[in-house]
């Protein structure tokens, strides 16, 4: 039987990403022996080498590296070079929702996007005399854009875990209910947009995963991996029916479109019946002109009123709600004054819950957004690094350059995101406003965000404990996570 290892290389110690487990499950369905190795950023080189010596055999065909945003560190680069030197005949394949890093010098192939079908073509080419995949050279690796081999819609997105994954009852897992989003917001560069029809997974698959994970591992808590979970009311009802049949009480977090939640009469009840108590609202802006420009045009007064009613409903009926309002700093026509006004409203009305804010990114490489091709129509223009250094202190400009470009030896190898300016602000000012908002968040002790609640893991902490966390109170839980990582490594190496 063909064998492979799939390394989860996310730097966050607390995260078991869904991607490597989905690929491993798919490989097993196709006759492979695939083992996932988690928390690789927290393994020493000696530990990683010991693991390889205990696992790699004559049937090992490839080593996979999986991350959501290509979290390739120097630590992983050294390990990858060791593999290439020690096992030169074993292929290295990375996969991510982002393009490969410039310094992945020993990785043979990088799959960009939902990767099951692209990986199928690649493996048949490598090991079964199949046709060569469409690939282009990108820095040091062969890049395969998975959109050429669409893995959506699929009949199901099941992930079944194994004993050697060492799942723990206090963990949060991700569960995929569908792929793609029916909407096309102007700032969004997700790979599957404008989906027509309901291609969500079946009730049977959803129920099977929930029951197996509870019966075998005692797991009850989940993040729903779908771009907009409440895009269709009938879909929410479908999964709600499953949850009401379970013999345990799960807790779900999901991306929820707030305007739909507010405008639909019974949507709140359906989400409550399904125990979707962690809700991430991509509001993006409370400025009316801005919201219209990004295609989220509900009246902002109605939006605020509706969000407060939703919060009141959940806070009154249970103590497991976490509503997170997310804003974009620098969205079209957003002013500094409107952002600070939004911040004041959050302080006055939302401190029992959470908010997040992100500087606007306009992608100019890889998958692009509507705004990528029309930013000049929305009063944006490119600003040079030289002008940014003239306007701002070096520390902030260095930070923005690193975030917006692929850098090596302090030089820009390739632009990732537009360095922009408009009449209201420039990209560095957006980062400064973002940082100020987070200073206020910490000062006012907002609660930990929806997905941060799901990320913080530790065997001594319950969901109730995590929901009490404000943004400042993390150390105890971080210590628990790192203790678990050490236990996990010992189990894998024993």
Where are these regions (language model features)?
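Structural recognition of alpha->loop->beta junctions
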Residues: 103-121, 270-278, 343-359
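Flexible glycine/acidic-rich beta-alpha junction loops that bind and position SAM and/or redox cofactors
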Residues: 98-103, 183, 234, 289-294, ...
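Radical SAM [4Fe-4S] cluster-binding motif and immediate context
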Residues: 153-319, 329
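Radical SAM enzyme core and accessory elements
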Residues: 1-9, 28-29, 33, 45-50, ...
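Acidic, low-complexity intrinsically disordered segments
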Residues: 1-209, 216-218
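Hydrophobic/aromatic residues located in beta-strands of well-ordered beta-sheets
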Residues: 4, 92, 222, 252, ...
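Short, electropositive alpha-helical surface patch
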Residues: 237-244, 334-352
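Short beta-strand/loop segments at the ligand-binding rim of alpha/beta enzyme cores
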Residues: 84-94, 249-252, 320-323
């Amino acid at each position: 039987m063909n064998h492979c290892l799939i390394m989860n290389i996310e730097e966050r110690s607390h995260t078991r990403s869904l991607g490597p487990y989905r690929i491993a499950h798919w490989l097993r369905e196709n006759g492979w022996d695939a083992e996932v190795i988690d928390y690789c950023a927290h393994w020493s080189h000696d530990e990683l080498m010991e693991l390889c010596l205990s696992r790699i055999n004559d049937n090992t065909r490839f080593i996979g590296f999986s991350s959501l945003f290509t979290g390739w560190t120097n630590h992983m680069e050294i390990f990858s070079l060791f593999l290439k030197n020690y096992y030169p005949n074993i292929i290295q394949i990375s996969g991510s929702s982002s393009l490969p890093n410039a310094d992945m010098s020993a990785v043979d192939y990088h799959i960009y996007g939902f990767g099951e079908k692209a990986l199928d073509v690649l493996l048949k080419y490598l090991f079964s005399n199949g046709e060569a995949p469409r690939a282009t050279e990108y820095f040091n690796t062969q890049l395969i854009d998975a959109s050429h081999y669409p893995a959506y819609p699929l009949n199901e997105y099941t992930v079944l875990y194994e004993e050697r994954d060492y799942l723990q009852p206090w963990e949060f897992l991700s569960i995929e209910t569908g792929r793609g989003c029916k909407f096309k917001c102007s700032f969004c560069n997700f790979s599957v947009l404008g989906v027509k029809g309901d291609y969500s997974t079946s009730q049977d698959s959803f129920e099977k995963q929930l029951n197996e994970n509870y019966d075998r591992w005692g797991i009850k808590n989940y993040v729903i991996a779908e771009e907009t979970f409440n895009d269709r009311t009938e879909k929410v009802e479908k999964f709600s029916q499953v949850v009401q049949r379970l013999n345990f009480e799960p807790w779900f977090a999901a991306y929820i479109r707030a305007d739909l939640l507010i405008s639909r009469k019974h949507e709140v009840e359906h989400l409550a019946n399904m125990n979707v108590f962690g809700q991430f609202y991509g509001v993006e802006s409370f400025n009316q002109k801005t919201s219209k420009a990004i295609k989220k045009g509900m009246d902002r007064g109605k939006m605020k009123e509706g969000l407060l009613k939703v919060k009141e409903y959940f806070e009154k009926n249970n103590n497991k709600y976490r509503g997170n309002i997310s804003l974009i700093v620098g969205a079209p026509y957003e002013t500094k004054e409107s952002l600070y006004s939004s911040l004041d409203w959050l302080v006055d009305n939302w401190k029992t819950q959470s908010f997040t804010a992100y500087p606007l990114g306009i992608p100019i490489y890889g998958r692009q957004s509507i705004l990528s091709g029309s930013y000049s129509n929305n009063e944006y223009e490119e600003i040079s690094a030289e002008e940014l250094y003239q306007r701002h202190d070096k520390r902030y400009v260095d930070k923005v350059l690193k975030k917006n470009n692929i850098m090596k030896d302090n030089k820009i190898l390739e632009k990732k995101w537009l360095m922009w300016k408009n009449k209201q602000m420039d990209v560095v000012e957006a980062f400064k406003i973002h940082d100020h908002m987070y200073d206020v968040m910490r000062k006012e002790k907002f609660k930990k965000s929806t997905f941060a609640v799901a990320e913080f893991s530790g065997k001594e902490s319950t969901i109730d404990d995590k929901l009490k966390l404000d943004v400042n109170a993390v150390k105890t839980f971080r210590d628990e996570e790192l203790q678990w990582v050490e236990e996990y490594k010992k189990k894998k190496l024993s």
